[in-house]
């Protein structure tokens, strides 16, 4: 019996959310959970819109001083269940650089291993309300070097931070797509709404540009162009 070959014409889209789970997130725990679940729904809807050209996966890394909890790890979006109250319980410190470094490095290694067989796109969104204060494995320069290397491969990085000072962290690690986060119920809802709209624009633009059908170098250029204008709407 002939084995059916995998369809390699679709782009595998890896959606990574790196979510702060430090103690200060307790006051907006419900809003953070609701926002993540809305994002999951938004990605699921995007896959339905672009089912002929895109195949979506999600990784959700919730981090605090206790470690990095990979709630989802390259999970097919149709298999991702809603984030629950028990799965997201804020506590302790903010090892931001470790969370970014470990999660992005793992995905970089994985995508390099499958690059010969499939086209991949990676979107990384970092959501934090505080400063780095507990990393043990990664520092700012190491994270910056990793992010710059991944951006050259067409990855998109965005950083959502509470306060102008927190957003300066993004600049130090080579992330230019930033959004200010007002830590209220309404502010948290607005942040996730805007993030999901930006993500939808990115997916729709990928589909319009027929990214999966382009030559490898052309695909990379398209992704880099889309990544640079992630939060810039219709500009």
Residue ranges and their predicted role:
Residues 1-235:
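Acidic, low-complexity intrinsically disordered regions
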